[in-house]
């Protein structure tokens, strides 16, 4: 889990647009965040396994 201060800091509008970065909406993780879902890879995987994301299925071939 990310520190509350870092989550609050990321919610503020940066002085320069380049400084903005994405965080997971669920846990606050800053790395490996999928923009389409707004989730990190860990949360995305957990929610997909539980069937909480419509249209997402585990691939098998």
From Swiss-Prot:
SUPFAM superfamilies: Glucocorticoid receptor-like (DNA-binding domain). GO terms for cellular component: cytoplasm; small ribosomal subunit. Zn(2+) binds at residues 24, 27, 40, 43. Keywords: Metal-binding, Ribonucleoprotein, Ribosomal protein, RNA-binding, rRNA-binding, Zinc. Gene3D superfamilies: 30s Ribosomal Protein S14, Chain N (4.10.830.10). Binds 16S rRNA, required for the assembly of 30S particles and may also be responsible for determining the conformation of the 16S rRNA at the A site. Belongs to the universal ribosomal protein uS14 family. Zinc-binding uS14 subfamily. HAMAP family: Ribosomal_uS14_2_B (MF_01364_B). This is Small ribosomal subunit protein uS14. It comes from Frankia alni (strain DSM 45986 / CECT 9034 / ACN14a).
């Amino acid at each position: 889990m990310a520190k509350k201060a870092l989550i609050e800091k990321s919610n503020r509008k940066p002085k320069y647009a380049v400084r903005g970065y994405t965080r997971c909406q669920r846990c606050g993780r800053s790395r490996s965040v999928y923009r389409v879902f707004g989730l990190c890879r860990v949360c995305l995987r957990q929610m997909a396994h539980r069937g909480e994301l419509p249209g997402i299925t585990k691939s098998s071939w």
